[in-house]
From Swiss-Prot:
Its main location: cytoplasm. Its cofactor is [4Fe-4S] cluster. Keywords: 4Fe-4S, Cytoplasm, Iron, Iron-sulfur, Metal-binding, S-adenosyl-L-methionine, Transferase. Binds 2 [4Fe-4S] clusters. One cluster is coordinated with 3 cysteines and an exchangeable S-adenosyl-L-methionine. It catalyses: L-aspartate(89)-[ribosomal protein uS12]-hydrogen + (sulfur carrier)-SH + AH2 + 2 S-adenosyl-L-methionine = 3-methylsulfanyl-L-aspartate(89)-[ribosomal protein uS12]-hydrogen + (sulfur carrier)-H + 5'-deoxyadenosine + L-methionine + A + S-adenosyl-L-homocysteine + 2 H(+). Residues 140-369 form the Radical SAM core domain. This is Ribosomal protein uS12 methylthiotransferase RimO. Belongs to the methylthiotransferase family. RimO subfamily. One of its GO terms (molecular function) is metal ion binding. Its EC number is 2.8.4.4. It comes from Gloeothece citriformis (strain PCC 7424) (Cyanothece sp. (strain PCC 7424)). The gene is rimO. Signal peptide: none annotated.
Length: 438
C-alpha cells in the first residue's frame, strides 16, 4: 500500500474535546499512521473544533482559514463540524472530510476513504457514542495529569446552551469501566485524575436510574492515584452522600468546580435552571460546614437577557458574601439555536463587559487574600514544567486546577510528573511562590 500519510491534530476547545483528540491520535497510531506535532510536516491536519460560544467559533474559523491558505488538506472534527457541517464543506474546499462529535472513533476509516479520493461527511444526526478504556488513547497533557470522562452529553436544556444539540443526551460509562481506565492511567504514572462530563454530579443517572457519583468516588478511592479532582459539579447534585464521599475518600481533593452561572432566582428561571435559585446558598454553606478546607471555583454569566441592575447587584453581593477561591465570568453569548437568542431585553455588549470587569475586580482581593493565607504553609505541588533558563520549576497545588487556576513557581530540585512538598514564601492574585522542602 506504500507509505501512510502523516497526520497532525490541532486541538481547540474544552477537555471533552481534548479527550476526543487523544482517542483519534491513539487510533491513528495503532493503525500505523505517523503522527507529527508539526502541522507543516503533516499531509493531513485534523482540526478538532469548538462551537460553544461565538469567540470559540471565531478561533476555530481562524485556524481553518490559516491551514487552508497554507494549502493543507484539512479534516474538520468536533463541535463546529457537528454544528455547521454543510456550511463548512461548501465554504472550505480544502476540507477533505468532516467528522461529528459522535463519530471520531471512525477517524482511521475516514482517512482511508479520503485517500481513495472521496470527500467524506461522517456525522451522526444524534451523537450516541462514548469511548471506554478499550479505545486507544495518546495523552496530550503533562505527564502527571489525565482527564477521565465519566459521561458524555447532557439531558438538561439550559436556555443559553447548545451543548445537548452538539453532543447529544447523557450517556454514562459503568463504574467498572471508569475504574479500569483509572488503573491504566495509574500504571502510566498519572498523579492527578480530573473527572469530567457535562454534569459530573448527574453521572450514572441514565445507566443506573439514579446518580452514582458517590459510589464512583468510593471505587476510585481504591486506585493508586494521589489526586482525584471533580469538574462540572452542579449544585443540586451535591447531595449529603456525595459530599461525604468527597470528605471520606482520601485521594479525592476537596476541590469543587460549580458552574453556578448566576445567583438571582429570576435570571436562573430565565436560564431554565429554576431549581438552582433555591439551593445556591444552602449548598455552599453545607459544603463549607462539611469540608472546611474546600476550595470552590465557579463561573458566572453576566448580561443574560433581562438582567437588570437589581439582578446584577444580587450577583455582586453573592460573590462578595461567599468569597469563592476562583471565579470565571463570561459575557452572555447569544446562540441561534437556543431560546435565549430570541429573548427580549438583550443587554448591550459594552454593559456586559463593564459588569464582567467589575466582578473580576471584586474577586481579585478575595483571591489574593486566599493565596496569601498559604504563605508559610508546606503544600504538596505537582511539578509540570521546568524553565530551562532559570532552572525554576512550575507546578500546581491541590487548590489549583490545570489551565483555569493559578500556578506554583518552585525553587529547588524536582522531577517532572512528581508531587513534592513545597514551602510557600510569597503569593499574588493568581499564583504562589515557594521552595522545595528536602
Amino acid at each position: 500500500m506504500g507509505n501512510k500519510p502523516t497526520i497532525a491534530i490541532s486541538h481547540l476547545g474544552c477537555e471533552k474535546n481534548r479527550i476526543d483528540s487523544e482517542h483519534m491520535l491513539g487510533l491513528l497510531a495503532q493503525a500505523g499512521y505517523p503522527v507529527d506535532a508539526n502541522e507543516e510536516l503533516a499531509d493531513y491536519v485534523i482540526v478538532n473544533t469548538c462551537s460553544f460560544i461565538q469567540s470559540a467559533r471565531e478561533e476555530s474559523v481562524r485556524t481553518l482559514v490559516e491551514l487552508a491558505e497554507a494549502n493543507k488538506k484539512v479534516i474538520i472534527s468536533g463541535c463546529m463540524a457537528q454544528h455547521f457541517q454543510d456550511e463548512l464543506l461548501s465554504e472550505l474546499p480544502e476540507a477533505v472530510a468532516i467528522v461529528g462529535t459522535g463519530d471520531y472513533q471512525k477517524i482511521v476509516q475516514v482517512i482511508q476513504r479520503v485517500e481513495n479520493g472521496q470527500r467524506v461527511k461522517e456525522i451522526s444526526s444524534e451523537p450516541t457514542y462514548i469511548a471506554d478504556e478499550t479505545v486507544p488513547r495518546y495523552r496530550t497533557t503533562s505527564e502527571g495529569v489525565a482527564y477521565l470522562r465519566v459521561a458524555e452529553g447532557c439531558d438538561y436544556r439550559c436556555s443559553f446552551c447548545i451543548i445537548p444539540h452538539l453532543r447529544g443526551n447523557q450517556r454514562s460509562r459503568t463504574i467498572e469501566s471508569i475504574v479500569r481506565e483509572a488503573q491504566q492511567l495509574a500504571d502510566q504514572g498519572v498523579q492527578e485524575l480530573i473527572l469530567i462530563s457535562q454534569i459530573t454530579t448527574n453521572y450514572g443517572l441514565d445507566l443506573y436510574g439514579e446518580p452514582k457519583l458517590a459510589q464512583l468516588l468510593q471505587a476510585l478511592g481504591e486506585v493508586d492515584i494521589p489526586w482525584i479532582r471533580i469538574h462540572y459539579a452542579y449544585p443540586t447534585g451535591l447531595t449529603p452522600k456525595v459530599i461525604e464521599a468527597i470528605r471520606e475518600t482520601p485521594n479525592v481533593l476537596p476541590y469543587l468546580d460549580l458552574p453556578l452561572q448566576h445567583s438571582h432566582p429570576d435570571i436562573l428561571k430565565r436560564m431554565n435552571r429554576p431549581w438552582q435559585g433555591r439551593v445556591n446558598d444552602s449548598i455552599i454553606e453545607r459544603i463549607k460546614d462539611a469540608i472546611p478546607k474546600a476550595v470552590l471555583r465557579t463561573t458566572f454569566i453576566v448580561g443574560f437577557p433581562g438582567e437588570t441592575e437589581e439582578h446584577y447587584a444580587h450577583l455582586v453581593e453573592f460573590v462578595k458574601r461567599h468569597e469563592f477561591d476562583h471565579v470565571g465570568v463570561f459575557t452572555f453569548s447569544p446562540e441561534e439555536e437556543t431560546p435565549a437568542y430570541h429573548m427580549a431585553n438583550q443587554i448591550p455588549q459594552e454593559i456586559m463587559e463593564q459588569r464582567r470587569d467589575t466582578i473580576m475586580q471584586i474577586q481579585q482581593p478575595i483571591s489574593l487574600q486566599k493565596n496569601c493565607a498559604c504563605i508559610g504553609d508546606i503544600v504538596d505541588v505537582l511539578i509540570e514544567q521546568e524553565n530551562p533558563d532559570t532552572g525554576q520549576f512550575i507546578g500546581r497545588s491541590a487548590r489549583f486546577a490545570p489551565e483555569v487556576d493559578g500556578l506554583v513557581y518552585v525553587e529547588g530540585e524536582a522531577s517532572l510528573g512528581t508531587i513534592i512538598p513545597v514551602k510557600i514564601k510569597d503569593a499574588d492574585i493568581y499564583d504562589l511562590y515557594g521552595e522545595v522542602i528536602n
